[in-house]
Amino acid sequence: MTETPALEPLAPLELEPLPDEPLESDPRHSPDTDWSPWSAPLALLGGLVLAATAGLVVDLPALAFGVKLTSSHTPAGLVIADTFVQDVAFVVAAYYCARMGHRVVRAWQFGLRPPGVGWRSAAMMIGLLLLGFIMLDAAWSEIVHPSKEKLLETLGTKESTALLIFSAALTCIVAPICEEFLFRGYIFTALRNWHGTLLAAILTGLVFGGVHATSAPAADLLPLALLGFGLCLLYRYTGSLYPGMLAHALNNSIAFASLAGWSWVGAIPLIIGAPASILLLVAACNRAGFFTSPTGLSRSAA
């Protein structure tokens, strides 16, 4: 009788291990992550390099089409386009650094979630931060008498209504969202893994002020650094990036209206409209499931 040969055991399937799912931390404080503190300067440098590179992508075609661009003068429309590209580059750099090492990235890790302390408490903190900053800035101006900022002239707000609208949207909506995403959402969060909240807030504030050296008078950099410090604490103790975006938008709206010479009545639409636009954008993203889906910001890689 012929014996049936024994079947060889099947080799075990070697499945690629799934990336570790980050666990959401206490929502009453800004998220705890495993982002290396040394990746914070990398994110900033990457954002600046990416912004410069992307700026060339915008500027070179403009030159090819006959736009007059010199070292001393850049057309207002091109300044707006370059600044928009810079803001987007900040977001891309922060997200890329968070993804290094094939990490899973979730929206809550960038503070894209409702304030864990509640909106009422968050609103009070926003009010206190802005009141303190306005008083400090007024006192500082009386001491140093800084020169008037020429940002609006650079953006061409007096050249046309369209440039005025685009400038206001860029300054009061786009910039607060993108800058908070990089500086508070990533840099501050990564630096907290080095020596804690206080030093991380100080360093982030200094970097935040320094980045504005090309658009603000030198005398304004210290108040901006202190505002950056305060925004870090606001993020840390509300658990959400949204209050910082709103505070940033309110501050920029007030500054924009002041530089434009508007009355308080004339400034109300911008002061209300900019934060409202951010809230509507957040609501739209949440409704689309971008911030709340199980795969969060990494759904394309899941």
Ranges and model annotations:
Residues Q86-F90, S167-T171, P223-L231, G273-S277:
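Hydrophobic core segments of transmembrane alpha-helices in multi-pass, intramembrane catalytic enzymes
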